[in-house]
């Protein structure tokens, strides 16, 4: 146990400060509480807007690494880590990515997803060990997520990632003057003090989730996983996603649902491949070969086939 006399105060951190708007939180009616939360959550949108350039840089730099065979790692503890795991877990069904491409790493491992293991965030050495355990290299991207900016586990991971030349991104909800951190890209989501003082699962967590949504979706757009605003690399793994795949085909091509079903089956249940087959008359292997030549970019593959 840390000597209490030596424990530094974190009260100066933005995420730990008292929100004057909620001084009487325990006296509010349920409706007043809902209204106050709704009012405060507007700060998350402003925080994302203020971080727009750093988010865009992260998308571009991450996509470039992934095109060269790299991977994306989200690393965090508590709510921050769980949000990284959540975003990573959504990539395979949404974009048909292999599970290793985007990985979420949480202090305490899978058990910490359902049972808080807050003490593990203090273990700098555990974060550093992740880099070796996952064989992170200079091709990879490591996004360290820490709402308060001080999590030793996250700093250990980022320091070790820098040591092997990985692209590093630091995401925190405190200003630079409160917590400084060397990283290739620095994302600050300044949502202000929480309504429940120090509870960063609230606005800080919401802004973090928004930022991760933007990053992962933006990267996948850059990698050609989207056509228009359709998830044409969707993994057809259940009835809902099968229906979505059929609707994408009918909407984009104008064919009826029966024809779309037949096309989808011929394509091996690959929507992007099916679209290219429809437009070009290619069979499934030839369509896939053309997509591979064009790095998965459907627009480019279609142009190459129709306007050689």
Swiss-Prot record:
Domain SIS, first and last residues per copy: 62-225
Classification via InterPro entries: Etherase_MurQ, Glucokinase_regulatory_CS, MURQ/GCKR, SIS_dom, SIS_dom_sf
GO biological process, alphabetically ordered: amino sugar catabolic process; N-acetylmuramic acid catabolic process; peptidoglycan turnover
Pfam families: GKRP-like_C, GKRP_SIS_N
General function of this protein: Specifically catalyzes the cleavage of the D-lactyl ether substituent of MurNAc 6-phosphate, producing GlcNAc 6-phosphate and D-lactate.
Pathway given in the UniProt record: Amino-sugar metabolism; N-acetylmuramate degradation
Gene: murQ
EC number(s) per entry: 4.2.1.126
NCBIfam families linked to this entry: N-acetylmuramic acid 6-phosphate etherase, PRK05441.1, PRK12570.1
Keyword Nucleotidyltransferase: no
Sequence similarity: Belongs to the GCKR-like family. MurNAc-6-P etherase subfamily.
Reaction equations catalysed: N-acetyl-D-muramate 6-phosphate + H2O = N-acetyl-D-glucosamine 6-phosphate + (R)-lactate
Protein name according to UniProt: N-acetylmuramic acid 6-phosphate etherase
Gene3D superfamilies recorded: 1.10.8.1080, Glucose-6-phosphate isomerase like protein, domain 1 (3.40.50.10490)
Note: A lyase-type mechanism (elimination/hydration) is suggested for the cleavage of the lactyl ether bond of MurNAc 6-phosphate, with the formation of an alpha,beta-unsaturated aldehyde intermediate with (E)-stereochemistry, followed by the syn addition of water to give product.
GO MF term (any one): ether hydrolase activity
Gene source species: Thermosynechococcus vestitus (strain NIES-2133 / IAM M-273 / BP-1)
Entry-linked HAMAP family: MurQ (MF_00068)
Keywords of this entry: Carbohydrate metabolism, Lyase
SUPFAM superfamilies: SIS domain
Superkingdom per UniProt: Bacteria
Active-site residues, as the UniProt record annotates them: 90, 121
Subunit structure: Homodimer.
